[in-house]
Amino acid sequence: MLRSLRSQRQTARVSIEREPLLTAGIGLMLVQYVESETAWIPSAVKGTTNGAVAASEAAKLGVPWGVSVWCDLEGVKPGTPAQKVIDYCNSWHAAVSGGGYVPGVYVGYHAGLTPTQLYRSLRFTHYWGAYNLNTDQYPAVRGLQMKQLRPARKDVVPNFGIDFQIDKISADALGGRPTLLALEGWPELP
């Protein structure tokens, strides 16, 4: 399960939501959504600020170091120079890794970077793709470790009050995998 983190607004819940998920056998990672899914302009300053907030919120939720925290990269305003996107992402990465977490990037619609830029210009080694991300948009060489799936009726869990999505997790082309918080003895990936 991916739990969202605030970028500017206060987190609605704290660690009280963590334990029921873990007890139910659900692994937990964190994602910080961007300010707009349609037209935002990234910068190095925003990356540093948002990354610091993500690391701080992860700590407030009681998530231990070493768990993946994901940067949402989508909705970049068309025409934004790629270097601004790169600076945002690398600053976000530095802040999150400086907090002890494993930074990953969610590549969604209008990410503002080419597959080669995603792989060669960013510090990230963990990539997660939107359900509508085509294979020719995946980070060059490495590929994805997680792929969001289209929601299906069978994915709804009865009597579970949290909205969630299904993602397929696998090793990328270089053997990398995301890390998550789970109870001791949680199944390992094949």
Predicted feature descriptions by range:
Residues 117-190:
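Functionally critical loop-and-helix segments that line ligand-binding/catalytic clefts
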Residues 1, 26-32, 67-71, 103-105, ...:
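Hydrophobic faces of well-ordered beta-strands that scaffold small-molecule active sites
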Residues 97-114:
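Aromatic-lined carbohydrate-recognition surfaces of secreted/lumenal glycan-active proteins
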Residues 3-6, 33-35, 74-76, 108-112, ...:
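Active-site beta-loop-alpha junctions enriched in small/polar residues
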Residues 1-90, 98:
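Substrate-binding cleft of extracellular glycoside hydrolase catalytic domains
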Residues 40, 57, 65-70, 111-132:
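Accessory recognition modules or surfaces
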